């Protein structure tokens, strides 16, 4: 059995040694096959793999750029939101200040009107008081003249009457 195995291993029955022709043909065939594989299979396969690698790298770069853009947009949105909130706060503060000013103006105008009404009322009261005093003075003078004329039993002149009235008014005012 070992002889049969040796025969198959060595290549053919009855030959001895290495068959260089077969080895060279096999080697040349193998090299041709490698060259054909490189040209028709390995080259296009490598091109496809290189293109795929390029596409993947491009997609990764695009994704990173999109991420950066998204971060920038998020920062811009945060900044815009902050500016908007600041502006709203400023408007609210201005509104409060304006409301306080209007409140103070309304109170001031109301005080001015009230003071004007009080002054008008006081002026009217003083006018009425002066009229009442003048009426009382006229009545007193008429009564004084009447009493004096009855006491003296004579009529006095208008000039004398005025002098007497002024004298009595002065005396009444001093008391």
Curated annotation (Swiss-Prot):
Q: Which UniProt keywords apply?
A: ATP synthesis, Cell membrane, CF(0), Hydrogen ion transport, Ion transport, Membrane, Transmembrane, Transmembrane helix, Transport
Please report the record's description of how this protein sits within the membrane. Answer: Single-pass membrane protein
Tell me where it mainly resides: membrane
Under Gene Ontology molecular function, one entry of this record is: proton-transporting ATPase activity, rotational mechanism
The UniProt transmembrane annotation reads 17-37
Q: Which SUPFAM superfamilies match?
A: F1F0 ATP synthase subunit B, membrane domain
Q: Where in or outside the cell is it found? A: Cell membrane
Q: Indicate the quaternary assembly.
A: F-type ATPases have 2 components, F(1) - the catalytic core - and F(0) - the membrane proton channel. F(1) has five subunits: alpha(3), beta(3), gamma(1), delta(1), epsilon(1). F(0) has three main subunits: a(1), b(2) and c(10-14). The alpha and beta chains form an alternating ring which encloses part of the gamma chain. F(1) is attached to F(0) by a central stalk formed by the gamma and epsilon chains, while a peripheral stalk is formed by the delta and b chains.
* PANTHER family recorded: ATP SYNTHASE SUBUNIT B, ATP SYNTHASE SUBUNIT B', CHLOROPLASTIC
Any idea what job this protein has? F(1)F(0) ATP synthase produces ATP from ADP in the presence of a proton or sodium gradient. F-type ATPases consist of two structural domains, F(1) containing the extramembraneous catalytic core and F(0) containing the membrane proton channel, linked together by a central stalk and a peripheral stalk. During catalysis, ATP synthesis in the catalytic domain of F(1) is coupled via a rotary mechanism of the central stalk subunits to proton translocation.
Identification of the protein by name: ATP synthase subunit b
Please report the organism this UniProt entry assigns to the protein: Staphylococcus saprophyticus subsp. saprophyticus (strain ATCC 15305 / DSM 20229 / NCIMB 8711 / NCTC 7292 / S-41)
**Gene label:** atpF
